[in-house]
Amino acid sequence: MKFLNILTLAFITGMASAAAVPGGTTTNDAASTLDNLNNKRSVCGQLCFNNKDCGGPCPKCNTKEGVCVKK
């Protein structure tokens, strides 16, 4: 009887976790996290703490406001 309870619990847990994924298990074709961070570095007005957080057309970090600005 215990084996049946454990098996039932595993089945219900599996069904609940499968139902929690609305689009099913699809692959993510988006760029990697590192690529996303590199793309965001080139945006003016992005939050920053030092010049390493900024890049592209806005390479300087305005530490008073905490955003990337043009030179």
UniProtKB/Swiss-Prot annotation:
Subcellular location: Secreted
Keyword entries, A-Z: Disulfide bond, Knottin, Secreted, Signal
Cystine bridges: 44-58, 48-61, 54-68
GO CC, one annotated term: extracellular region
Keyword flag Signal: yes
Predominant location: secreted
Signal peptide as annotated in the record: 1-18
Family indicated by similarity: Belongs to the UPF0499 family.
Domain commentary: The presence of a 'disulfide through disulfide knot' structurally defines this protein as a knottin.
Annotated protein name in UniProt: UPF0499 protein ACLA_083080
